[in-house]
C-alpha cells in the first residue's frame, strides 16, 4: 500500500526543553550530532510505500529538510489545525501521522507498525505499548499508563488513518488527540459505565474499540504490544538525555 506521511514539527522550543537548547524549534534540537526531526524523516524517506512527506512547521526553521519527497507545509494555530492541514494536503487514501520527537523509531519498527495497520483493515490505528516492555527497554522512564483487562499500557506517538473516515469523525478524533497523553480522560469520552470499568481495571480493548466505533462511526484498532520505542517522545529533559545516550553510542 502506498500512502503519504505527515510529520508535526512546528512546536516552538519555549517549554520544558528550552533550557537544553537555544534552537527556536524543538524539532531541531541536537541529538547525537543531528537535529531530532532528521531521525524520523530519514526513516520515512527510506520507505518505498511512503510517497510523500508533509513536514508541518515554519519554513525558516525547516527548509533544510525539503527534498523531492519532503514538502514543507506552513503550520496552523495549534496541533489540531496542523493535523487537519496535513490531512487536507494528503492525496492518498490512508495517511501516517507522526510526531517529530521520536528519534528511536527505526525503519524496522515503522515497517512492523504499518504492516499491522494494513492487516487490521481499520480506519484508525493507534499503537499501544506494554508497560513491562517499556520498563525493560527503558528502565526508569516515566510515562502515563492505563491498566485494562489485557494489561498496563501507554500510547504511542504516531497513528494511521483513512482520510475520509477521520474527516467525517473529526470532532471526536480531535478530543482523542488532545487526550493522547491522558488515557483516563480518553476513556472518559466513552461513557460513565465504560469509564467505571476502566477505573476498576475491568474494561477490555474490544469493549473500548466497539464503543469508539459506535460513537464516531469508524473502525478503530488499538495495536497492542507495539515496539516500546514508539512510546518514547522527547518532551522533557530526561527524555532528551535518554535519547542522546542511546543514539550517541
List each model region and its residues:
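Short, conserved phosphate/pyrophosphate- and ester-handling motifs at nucleotide-, phospho-/glycolipid
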Residues: 236
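N-terminal nucleotide-binding beta1-loop-alpha1 segment
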Residues: 1-22
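Conserved active-site beta-strand element of glycosyltransferases/polysaccharide synthases
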Residues: 221-224, 233
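Conserved N-terminal catalytic core of the sugar/cofactor nucleotidyltransferase
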Residues: 3-7, 34-94, 107, 201-203
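Conserved core of the sugar-phosphate nucleotidyltransferase
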Residues: 107-214, 225-229
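Short beta-strand-to-loop acidic/aromatic patch adjacent to the donor-nucleotide binding site
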Residues: 93-103
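Short amphipathic alpha-helices within nucleic acid-binding modules
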Residues: 240-245
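Short catalytic helix/loop segments, enriched in acidic residues and glycine
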Residues: 21-40
Amino acid at each position: 500500500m502506498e500512502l503519504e506521511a505527515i510529520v508535526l514539527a512546528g512546536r516552538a522550543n519555549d517549554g520544558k526543553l528550552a533550557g537544553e537548547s537555544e534552537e527556536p524549534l524543538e524539532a531541531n534540537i541536537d541529538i547525537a550530532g543531528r537535529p531530532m526531526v532528521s531521525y524520523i524523516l530519514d526513516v520515512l524517506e527510506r520507505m518505498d510505500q511512503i510517497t510523500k512527506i508533509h513536514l508541518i512547521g515554519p519554513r525558516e526553521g525547516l527548509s533544510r529538510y525539503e527534498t523531492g519527497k519532503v514538502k514543507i507545509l506552513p503550520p496552523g494555530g495549534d496541533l489540531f489545525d496542523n493535523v487537519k492541514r496535513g490531512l487536507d494536503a494528503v492525496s492518498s487514501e490512508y495517511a501516517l501521522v507522526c510526531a517529530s520527537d521520536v528519534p528511536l523509531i527505526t525503519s524496522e519498527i515503522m515497517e512492523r507498525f504499518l504492516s499491522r495497520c494494513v492487516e487490521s483493515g481499520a480506519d484508525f490505528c493507534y499503537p499501544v505499548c506494554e508497560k513491562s516492555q517499556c520498563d525493560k527497554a527503558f528502565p526508569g522512564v516515566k510515562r502515563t499508563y492505563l491498566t485494562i483487562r489485557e494489561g498496563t499500557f501507554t500510547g504511542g506517538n504516531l497513528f494511521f488513518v483513512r482520510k475520509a473516515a477521520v474527516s467525517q469523525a473529526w470532532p471526536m478524533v480531535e478530543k482523542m488527540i488532545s487526550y493522547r497523553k491522558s488515557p483516563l480522560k480518553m476513556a472518559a469520552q466513552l461513557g460513565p459505565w465504560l469509564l467505571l470499568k476502566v477505573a476498576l481495571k475491568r474494561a477490555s480493548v474490544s469493549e473500548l474499540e466497539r464503543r469508539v466505533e459506535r460513537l464516531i462511526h469508524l473502525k478503530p484498532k488499538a495495536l497492542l504490544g507495539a515496539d516500546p520505542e514508539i512510546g518514547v517522545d522527547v518532551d522533557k529533559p530526561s527524555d532528551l538525555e535518554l535519547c542522546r545516550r542511546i543514539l550517541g553510542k
